[in-house]
């Protein structure tokens, strides 16, 4: 269950960034999670909810945008959204070209796990 370690890293990074910017409250965090990370967004959100209890991040809205797998095929030159072999073990997704079914593809998107945006409130904004 790598959702726990990823959730912990994200919560720590969000709280550290908020602290460095003198935040008194975090109101929103937007995350980008690639399909090839094999992270379950519901489990990730659940873990983050537990880890952010009793912090300035506790009541913030968390938005998780899933990023589809984008590939470029070495054989036919296709460039676009891929499909994964759903018959494979869930621990190892295989991206294939939707045009020629080849697995010789360059993965362009779908592996990321980013904190895209953090919205905060500062004390001076409430004065």
Swiss-Prot record:
GO annotation, biological process: protein maturation; protein modification process
MF annotations from Gene Ontology: nickel cation binding; zinc ion binding
Entry binding sites for Zn(2+): 73, 76, 97, 100
Xref: InterPro entries: Hydgase_Ni_incorp_HypA/HybF_CS, HypA/HybF
Keyword terms: Metal-binding, Nickel, Zinc
Binding site for Ni(2+): 2
Pfam families found in the cross-reference section: HypA
Job of this protein: Involved in the maturation of [NiFe] hydrogenases. Required for nickel insertion into the metal center of the hydrogenase.
PANTHER family: HYDROGENASE MATURATION FACTOR HYPA
Family: Belongs to the HypA/HybF family.
Protein's UniProt name: Hydrogenase maturation factor HypA
Provenance organism: Methanosphaera stadtmanae (strain ATCC 43021 / DSM 3091 / JCM 11832 / MCB-3)
Name of the gene this protein is made from: hypA
């Amino acid at each position: 269950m790598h959702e726990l370690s990823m959730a912990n890293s994200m919560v720590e990074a969000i709280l550290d960034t908020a602290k460095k910017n003198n935040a008194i409250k975090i109101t929103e965090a937007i995350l980008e999670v690639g399909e090839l990370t094999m992270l379950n967004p519901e489990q990730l959100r659940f873990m983050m909810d537990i880890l952010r209890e009793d912090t300035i991040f506790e009541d913030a809205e968390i938005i998780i945008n899933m990023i589809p797998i984008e590939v470029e095929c070495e054989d036919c030159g296709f460039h676009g959204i891929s499909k994964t072999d759903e018959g494979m073990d869930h621990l190892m997704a295989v991206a294939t070209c939707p045009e020629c079914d080849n697995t010789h593809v360059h993965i362009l998107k779908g592996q990321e796990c980013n904190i895209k945006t953090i919205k905060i409130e500062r004390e001076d904004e409430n004065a």
